[in-house]
């Protein structure tokens, strides 16, 4: 079951992934290449200090917000389905269960009265 939120999540999240994957594996956008063809890492102070960029923070917020919205929508649908089912069975007439309930109520003596139920012998 595909949801519209999943399509939106993929549309917004997938363009950000390739750029982030390259940086995660130590690749930079402009590597320094020596005369002999070896790539030298950039200076320790020139790169980021391990903090996430603004785009990464925004992408994380968007992804988790969409995930929360999808979970909320699924929960709401399940709740409405349960309420609709309960409303459909609330007013139904079931004679067999009604009779069982009435016979059980007649057989029990009221808790607060001192009367005995007719037809029962005292113990």
UniProtKB/Swiss-Prot annotation:
Regions of biased composition (Basic and acidic residues) lie at 96-117
Region (Disordered) location? 87-123
Keyword Protein transport in record: no
Q: Which residue spans traverse the membrane?
A: 60-80
Q: Where in the cell is it found?
A: Apical cell membrane; Cell junction, Tight junction
The record describes its quaternary structure and partners as: Component of a complex composed of CRB3, PALS1 and PATJ. Interacts (via C-terminus) with PALS1 (via PDZ domain). Interacts with PARD6A. Interacts (via intracellular domain) with EPB41L5. Interacts with WDR83.
Q: Which positions are tagged coiled coil? A: none
Membrane-topology annotation of the record? Single-pass type I membrane protein
Q: Which residues lie on this side of the membrane: Extracellular?
A: 27-59
Which cystines does this chain contain? none
At which residues is glycosylation annotated?
36
Taxonomic lineage is: Eukaryota, Metazoa, Chordata, Craniata, Vertebrata
The residues on the Cytoplasmic side of the membrane are 81-120
A cellular component term from Gene Ontology for this protein is:
subapical complex
Q: Which UniProt keywords apply?
A: Cell junction, Cell membrane, Glycoprotein, Membrane, Signal, Tight junction, Transmembrane, Transmembrane helix
Q: Which domain of life is it from?
A: Eukaryota
Q: Which organism is it from?
A: Canis lupus familiaris
- Motif PDZ-binding location, chain numbering: 119-123
Q: State the Gene Ontology terms under molecular function.
A: SH3 domain binding
Gene Ontology BP annotations: positive regulation of cell junction assembly; protein localization to plasma membrane
The domain-related comment in the record is:
The PDZ-binding motif is involved in the interactions with PARD6A and PALS1.
Output this protein's name: Protein crumbs homolog 3
Range of residues in the leader sequence: 1-26
Q: What does this protein do?
A: Involved in the establishment of cell polarity in mammalian epithelial cells. Regulates the morphogenesis of tight junctions. Involved in promoting phosphorylation and cytoplasmic retention of transcriptional coactivators YAP1 and WWTR1/TAZ which leads to suppression of TGFB1-dependent transcription of target genes such as CCN2/CTGF, SERPINE1/PAI1, SNAI1/SNAIL1 and SMAD7.
